Amino acid sequence: MIDIKFLRENPDIVKENIKKKFQNHKLHLVDEVIDFDSKKRAVNLKGDELRSKRNSLSSEIGNLMRNGKKDDAEAIKAEVQQINSELAENEKLETEYAEEIKSRMMKIPNIIADSVPIGEDDSKNVEIQKYGDPIVPEYEIPYHADIMESLCGLDLDAARRVAGNGFYYLVGDIARLHSAVLSYARDFMINKGFTYCIPPYMIRSDVVDGVMSFEEMDAMMYKIEGEDLYLIGTSEHSMIGKFKGQLLKKSEMPYTMTSYSPCFRKEKGAHGIEERGVYRIHQFEKQEMIVVCEPEESWDWYDKMWSYTVELFRSMDIPVRTLECCSGDLADLKAKSCDVEAWSPRQQKYFEVGSCSNLTDAQARRLGIRIKVEKGNYYAHTLNNTVVAPPRMLIALLENNYNEDGSVTIPEVLRPYMGGTEKLVPKK
């Protein structure tokens, strides 16, 4: 959510930003906010005048009573009661206008960074840099589900019987490899100075409203029937939610946290769920990182955060590239976002394995996350980034370390988490 003062003073900039995001259907919201804001300010002024008049009359009543002029005092009391009625009606209007403003402000996208390329969808995202040479093997690499099944590590049929499409059983060495990746990622981030956290896996609706747009919520979140609770789609939501309504000490900034959690997603929309495989599913595990920081530090943190993901993948010899997300591919709260993509030797192309975003103060405004200083308080900036998200990461790992004999070499950094195992061999 943007600053209403900024919108009030710069409506043309806000409208131009909406156009850059190809959301012209939202242009009317700016004028409507200005209209309701004007009405609310007039009502606020009237309320101040009524309260001032009431205070003056109340003092006069006291003087009249002390001087024995009870009848005159009673007449003024009647006038005060009339003012109270007007104030009640006025306050009702204040609340109504505030709700009208908020409902519209929540739909207006955050101001994107000047460096964001303009484009309607992810086909217009711009490559920033490649890291590592893409592997082009002379032998055929099987589909990732086939590799996992050859290692007796995946059972999709059983998962389908138990839960339907979009779920899986990981078994044996593949399950161990999955855990090894997450354990390595956890230690990697702790060594970067981040505080490890295991957060709640459900959040209330007011936190959902604070961390994402309605469109994102509808496409992603599972609601618990009969409860004001939603299953998290990423631990970023509950980690950022930890700071909801908090007044943070400037001396304790920044807050840098990393967490492991299961994630649950509807995956509604154009992509949907894979019929067979583990690339896009309803339930998966992820190591996430978030930063809550001073506004002037957020862009430095943004560059650090995506570089950590690149470093993690390169430590396992997986080639990656970074992409600058274009304006139309940014969710409404994001000012700038960078995707990290891993190389797929089987498909001979890159695929998304993580995303880093700077939301500037948009999320903090929704959640009321402020920094305390001597002269007033101000909103913090929030950022989030995927450290690693198995099983997508497993797809990249298995394909890039697949050998012609069907075995898979374990990257050296993961071997301590696999009991020293160097290679996974197909089961006969």
Where are these regions (language model features)?
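TRNA-recognition modules of translation machinery and tRNA-sensing kinases, especially anticodon-binding
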Residues: 27, 130-428
